[in-house]
Amino acid sequence: MKTAELELNREIMSEAEWLVARKDLLTREKEFTRQRDALSAARRQLPMVKVEKQYVFDGPKGKETLSDLFDGRSQLVVYHFMFGPDWQEGCKSCSYLADHFDGANWHLPHRDVSFVATSRAPLSKLQAYKKRMGWRFKWVSSEKNDFNFDYHVSFTAEDEKKNKAYYNYADGEYINDEMPGLSVFFKDETGDVFHTYSTYARGLDILVGAYNFLDLVPKGRDEDNLDFTMEWLRRHDEY
């Protein structure tokens, strides 16, 4: 059996020596926090794009427009959950993220924010999977509109045939018919809706509290020797 020292390949030192190293890292952590705060401020200052198209979703209350999803608030966060029309269950990586949504959603309404997930699977599949996972957040189906295509997280058979897809603000190879993302919208006092922000791929890391915990421990995410990141991951009822 490997010892902890060999397994982690970390230097062992005295408490006093460790404190010097820790304070050096703390300086870097504080600088990173300041940079993150500045980046968040810049994000909030991005220009907005008015949403001209009328999107109608299938939701627990029946037909709901994008405007309806604000639920009386001025800000809306939409998570694009990978769950295609012919899929039998939701993406396991999106499920990993979704395990964090309900905790945050206790607090978001108190900051004038509504949260909803959307997928192209029919509502009946979404509701069944939501029940299986024990989630409470609102989930609507975009099966009958272009929402996920317009926000570049769903792709067509033609995209697959050409092996091309526009994702994360760049043209690239086709990967899947569904990809993950998050979009943010604002509604003004007149009822006009604006798109303010979308993020994809590693931009979603900030949502994953479990990864943030793993980033604190000696082995970190421990994914370097896997065939792909998240290979270890299971839906929470499959471990």
Tell me the role of every PLM-derived stretch.
Residues P109-L126:
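Catalytic nucleophile loop
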Residues S119, S141-E143:
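Residues at the C-termini of beta-strands that transition into short coil/loop
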Residues M1-L76, F81-R111, A128-K131, K138, ...:
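Non-globular targeting/processing and membrane-anchoring segments
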